[in-house]
A protein has these predicted regions:
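Conserved catalytic-core motifs of GNAT/GCN5-like acyltransferases
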Residues: 122-135
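Conserved acetyl-CoA-binding loop-helix of GNAT-fold acetyltransferases
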Residues: 77-93
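Active-site rim helix/loop that mediates acceptor-substrate recognition in acyltransferases
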Residues: 17-47
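Conserved active-site tyrosine of GNAT-family acetyltransferases
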Residues: 114-121
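Conserved beta-strand-loop-alpha-helix junction that forms the acyl-donor binding cleft
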Residues: 103-114
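Short amphipathic alpha-helix that is part of the acyltransferase structural core
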Residues: 1-29, 127
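Conserved acetyl-CoA binding element of GNAT-fold acetyltransferases
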Residues: 62-79, 129
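Conserved beta-strand in the GNAT
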Residues: 43, 48-58, 64-67
Length: 135
């Protein structure tokens, strides 16, 4: 069975919140912190089961940020890693189709970093920090 790749909708929000709440080190971001008020991204499903999602921050440059990749903590099938790879590759295609040339992401999860490496992303081995402020 192949994966279904689609854009996020308002109906996905409660699912995403439940995933963020289930992962102990994650924080649920406010909707208005995310692109298009929580709908600016992609989700990967299999047999109508959502597996992984990520958000695409389009900029006024040739770059797009791929952020807030979150997965279904209850999905334990062997193709979980493949679903994450599909999300990233689909995001790349989506960005290319929108005339973007660069993608940028921030991460600390080793498994996710390794998937990016496998997909030929450049990884800066020096630690960096997300710095935010509500103004």
């Amino acid at each position: 069975m192949k994966f279904n790749i689609r854009k996020l909708t308002e109906n996905d929000w409660d699912t995403l919140v439940s995933w963020w709440d289930a992962w102990p080190s994650w924080v649920n971001p406010p909707k208005d912190f995310l692109p298009d008020n929580g709908t600016g991204g992609l989700i990967i499903e299999k047999n109508n089961i959502p597996i992984v999602a990520g958000f695409l921050y389009f900029t006024n440059s040739a770059a797009v940020l791929l952020e807030w990749i979150i997965s279904n903590p209850k999905y334990k099938e062997k193709d979980r890693k493949e679903a994450i790879e599909t999300l990233i590759k689909s995001a790349e295609i989506f960005c290319k189709n929108n005339n973007k040339k660069y993608m940028f992401s921030i991460g600390r999860n080793k498994s996710l970093i390794n998937i990016h490496k496998k997909l030929n992303w450049s990884i800066d081995e020096k630690a960096s920090y997300e710095i935010t402020k509500q103004i």
